[in-house]
Amino acid sequence: MRLILLGAPGAGKGTQATFICQKYGIPQISTGDMLRAAVKAGTPLGIEAKKVMDAGGLVSDDLIINLVKERIAQSDCAAGFLFDGFPRTIPQADAMKAAGVKLDYVLEIDVPFDAIIERMSGRRSHAASGRTYHVKFNPPKVAGVDDVTGEPLIQRDDDKEETVKKRLEVYSAQTRPLVDYYSNWAKAEPAAAPKYRAISGTGGVDEITARAFAALAG
């Protein structure tokens, strides 16, 4: 099972990636983890990437694709892999296609933006313990305070509505076009292209997992 998981920030990709990887016995690969591992291992590509990053530059798509090819050739990818957050742009998808990286599925977890904003901007946390709440879905017993200590809850900067909206704007501009890219490729070249599947990411976690497994079985 070789697949790409697509979806906006806050769509629940991380949760579903864990379940999919457990079911199929495959590793979850993110470019950040992959870069860090290559740098730590001191591979030729890792050394090259470190030079770029140390100079404050962005690692090129060509280098990322070479790292991807190196990573998926490792033994833990024998049964497949799940790409999380990659490719992020059309040029990366094109480069992956040109490099002959074979994929079975592209699975999109689709959640309306207003639901994502509600999901993320409603989160509150207790800084000292890491306990998390949600003003609507999992509220504390007393609004704004931690159930255990009675200390005030905070809203992380990442969860503030304006931050969430900015991240969704970046996703719309850069990554959302991949949905059309892969769905159009699947229609044009069904034999060569990965199967494109979209599921709703709203509802309970178990419900969404069942949808994901059903989509990957067909």
UniProtKB/Swiss-Prot annotation:
Query: What biological-process terms (Gene Ontology) are attached?
Result: AMP salvage
* UniProt-listed Enzyme Commission number(s): 2.7.4.3
Q: Which enzyme type, at the first EC level?
A: transferase
The record, for CDD domains, names: ADK
What are the UniProt keywords, alphabetically? ATP-binding, Cytoplasm, Kinase, Nucleotide biosynthesis, Nucleotide-binding, Transferase
Catalytic reaction list: AMP + ATP = 2 ADP
Write out the pathway annotation from the protein's UniProt entry: Purine metabolism; AMP biosynthesis via salvage pathway; AMP from ADP: step 1/1
The answer to whether the entry has keyword NAD is no
Kindly give the InterPro entries that the UniProt entry links to this protein. Answer: Adenyl_kin_sub (IPR006259), Adenylat/UMP-CMP_kin (IPR000850), Adenylat_kinase_CS (IPR033690), Adenylate_kinase_lid-dom (IPR007862), P-loop_NTPase (IPR027417)
Q: Which residues bind AMP?
A: 31, 36, 57-59, 85-88, 92, 156, 167
Which PROSITE patterns does this entry report, sorted A to Z?
ADENYLATE_KINASE
Q: What does this protein do?
A: Catalyzes the reversible transfer of the terminal phosphate group between ATP and AMP. Plays an important role in cellular energy homeostasis and in adenine nucleotide metabolism.
UniProt record similarity statement: Belongs to the adenylate kinase family.
- Can you say what this protein is called? Adenylate kinase
> What lineage does the source organism belong to?
Bacteria, Pseudomonadati, Pseudomonadota, Betaproteobacteria, Burkholderiales
